[in-house]
Amino acid sequence: MATFSEEQEALVNSSWEAFSQNIPQLSIIFYTSILEKAPEAKAMFSFLKDSDGVPKDNLDLEAHCEKVFELTRNSALQLRAKGKVEVERIALKFLGYVHAQRRVLDPHFLVLKEALLKTLKEAMGDKWSEEVSNAWGIAYDELAGVIKKGMS
């Protein structure tokens, strides 16, 4: 169980605001970063499978990116409020099933975390800090742990 401070929650919320201001551009940075580190991941995303590179103006891509960041932010809020991340049973089964079907492995979770942090750093510019990185990293790690449990 991770402890999450009020300051960490505030950092996640303020950086979420920076991210949500420019989802179309930041989603391209996010998926480009994923594919640079793990080109095989392209086949895991239906909206990337049949494209060369990362398509611009792709609503499915943008929605998925926003969902990843939103789930991670919600994990931070839960960590602060409850001391743990909880996902509804139906949602957990779905997340676990989808990730298992796509053959997501532990290294893929790490690649996604690195892409998430890189994207947030881009969104925040000079307001980025190690503290912001740590707060999002904790929230993401807890969420990934819950999804991995749902995969088994």
UniProtKB/Swiss-Prot annotation:
Induction details: Induced by polyamines (PA), abscisic acid (ABA) and gibberellic acid (GA), but repressed by ethylene and cytokinins (CK, an equimolar mixture of kinetin and 6-benzyl-aminopurine) in nodules. Induced by abscisic acid (ABA) in roots.
Null mutant phenotype: Smaller plants (shoots and roots), reduced number of leaves and nodules. Delayed growth associated with altered leaves metabolome linked to amino-acids processing, hormonal balance (increased accumulation of salicylic acid, but reduced methyl jasmonic acid levels), as well as fermentative and respiratory pathways.
Tissue: Mainly expressed in leaves and, at low levels, in roots of non-nodulated plants. However, accumulates also in nodules and roots, and, to a lower extent, in leaves, stems, flowers and fruits, in nodulated plants.
Record SUPFAM superfamilies: Globin-like
Residues holding heme b: S46, K67, H99, R102
Quaternary data: Monomer.
Record family assignment: Belongs to the plant globin family.
Function, as annotated: Atypical leghemoglobin that reversibly binds oxygen O(2) through a pentacoordinated heme iron. In nodules, facilitates the diffusion of oxygen to the bacteroids while preventing the bacterial nitrogenase from being inactivated by buffering dioxygen, nitric oxide and carbon monoxide. This role is essential for symbiotic nitrogen fixation (SNF). Seems not restricted to symbiotic nitrogen fixation and root nodules formation, but also contributes to general plant development and metabolism.
UniProt-listed PANTHER family: LEGHEMOGLOBIN-RELATED (PTHR22924), NON-SYMBIOTIC HEMOGLOBIN 2 (PTHR22924:SF92)
Protein name (Swiss-Prot/TrEMBL): Atypical leghemoglobin 2-1
Organism encoding this protein: Lotus japonicus (Lotus corniculatus var. japonicus)
